[in-house]
């Protein structure tokens, strides 16, 4: 009996350590009032993306859910309007596996929305296939699609600067290796899928790094955010059906809820004072160092050029900084600009809101300013 009690105590102690070090996510503070600002969140019909969109809506932002499924996207928008009390949550169709869909989304957004303050690339997949254009599906959805979308929306992001781009990455980037001669290589079998997934996560981190370099002094900053181990649809989607009932209780015990997974992306989108850390990788709401492959500026630029080619970007569609990226009358005291009043747009079912030194030391100062969590209850 004593042995059983001792064993139970050890198991409980081990779980407490796992819970506080892996499962429990630190809270996101940042700006509490986003009224008059607009955010786009991809893959926001479930999981981390939906919780991210919910918190943005609760803080008053106009939130565009960019999702592939119209049925699920509109249902999520309805849920979020009900939960947040904010009618400025809408759905717009976006399939990151299709370059044509990405361009159509950008055209529709730019023609109907007068501003963009926050762009969060949350959508992602973990298994592979081939798109109609014969692309590696993992590469297209996890990197090329977001890369193209960012480029197409940059004029709006620059016009609303200071603004932010957040790329939801993963600790899997540590296992990634990019073969620039075969970026679009076919992926066959689950082992290759695991490697290819890690490669796309490395691409996310390098993309954030190079984008920050390209947009230096424009007022647009970019961050790679690791949500942590999250119990989301992405985790169980490709698990055999017979195994899911066995894994669900375990996942509930040792993985974060989507609400916890949303904290670091929200931190990168909202925390004031982190602009000097643009291009860095965040986990648990603070900067983390990455392996050499993920901070290789030469590889990041090479990936940038290869991605332009794969995305079909022309010479005039690069992310070169504008000479005067911010208006002279901008007096925003916070890290995101105070928007000007907006007129309702014709394609929206709801009216637009009226506006109302040392790296370690720097990181410590930023962390000290984090406000208490606004709960996603």
UniProtKB/Swiss-Prot annotation:
Its EC number is 1.1.-.-. The lineage of its organism: Eukaryota, Metazoa, Chordata, Craniata, Vertebrata. InterPro entries: NAD(P)-bd_dom_sf, SDR_fam. One of its GO terms (cellular component) is extracellular region. Residues 368-377 have a biased composition (Basic and acidic residues). It is found in: Secreted. Belongs to the short-chain dehydrogenases/reductases (SDR) family. This is Dehydrogenase/reductase SDR family member 13. SUPFAM superfamilies: NAD(P)-binding Rossmann-fold domains (SSF51735). One of its GO terms (molecular function) is oxidoreductase activity. Residues 1-25 form the signal peptide.
